[in-house]
Every structure is written in C-alpha cells, then in structure tokens.
C-alpha cells in the first residue's frame, strides 16, 4: 500500500517544486485516503463525516509539506500519511463513551459475542462508560489505544480483558424455572 501511495502521488507532480498544492492534488490526496476507509473508526463514519475527515487530513499534509513535489518524492511517504491519519483520529477522540462507539460499535461487539444483543441505549452507555474509564487508566494515551485498534492487536491485548470485564454485568443470567404442580 505504501508503494502504491507513493506511485500514485508521483503521477500528479507539478512542474514547479515550491508551488502550493493544486486543487487536483488536494482532491487526489483526499481520494487516496479512501484506502484507509476500512480502518477502525473511519469505517464507522458516514460519507459526509469521512469527506470532512479526509479534507482535514489533506489540510494537515499540505501544511506540513507545502511542496507537493517534495512530499510525493519523500521516502516512506506512506508512513507519513499513516502518522497524519492516526494523529487526526486521536485528535478527534478522547476515550469517552460517545466516541468509543466509533471505534468499537455495539453491533460489532454483539457479532463478536462480547455483548448480548438487545441492550438498551442506557445499558450500552454503561458499558462504554466502563470501557472509557479502563482505557484512560490503562493506556498512557488514546493514541496508544488507537494504534492497537488499527493494527488488530486488540484480540490478544489487555483491551480484550477490559472489554470482557466491562461486558460481564450486561450478560444477564436468567434462570428458567419450571414449577410442576402435582
């Protein structure tokens, strides 16, 4: 993906090394971010929210790298793009119940068997409150948590334990008692 990103960036090089990015280059940068659409958090955004997000990332890239040519020719350009994406995600997120829904959606947690189906919004909020508290206590920064989430290290990490501990109270164990009268 890094090589693809670099090759695609080089196709839109302007003739002047120091000109600001053209609208075509900015548009291309936003379109290139579509490759990241399936990443945790970004896959939960609506098309409008994603358009705003990719516009902000393109703005950050242009601000950090005013010369599109220098940016496109930079070694490891894909890593730079990735760092800006992570920084943009973490600047939007703090470990709060409302924002954790974008990283770990309720439907996904039900599908994984972490939470039971049919929880009320109030009970879902209780789960996300618990998880936000544990994340804030465990990880030094939300960025560390986002890195784990992006690179699918949640399965074998401390985060999985936190998920299960916070989910445990929501698994109601009901007993079916049948009274047989003789």
Q: How would you describe each model-predicted region?
A:
Residues 8:
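Active-site acidic/histidine clusters and adjacent loop/turn architecture
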């Amino acid at each position: 993906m890094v090589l693809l990103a670099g090759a695609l960036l080089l196709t839109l090089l302007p003739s002047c090394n120091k000109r600001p990015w053209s609208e075509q280059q900015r548009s291309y940068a936003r379109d290139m971010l579509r490759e990241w659409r399936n990443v945790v958090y970004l896959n939960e955004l609506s098309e409008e929210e994603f358009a705003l997000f990719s516009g902000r990332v393109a703005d950050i890239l242009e601000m950090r790298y005013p010369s599109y040519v220098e940016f496109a020719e930079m070694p490891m350009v894909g890593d730079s793009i990735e760092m800006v994406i992570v920084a943009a995600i973490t600047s939007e997120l703090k470990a709060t119940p409302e924002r954790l829904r974008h990283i770990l959606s309720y439907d996904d947690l039900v599908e994984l068997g972490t939470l039971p189906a049919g929880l009320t919004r109030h009970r879902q909020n209780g789960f996300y409150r618990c998880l936000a508290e544990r994340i804030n206590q465990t990880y030094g920064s939300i960025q560390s948590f986002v890195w784990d989430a992006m690179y699918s290290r949640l399965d074998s990490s401390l985060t999985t334990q936190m998920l299960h501990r916070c989910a445990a109270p929501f698994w109601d164990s009901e007993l079916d008692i049948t009274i047989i009268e003789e």
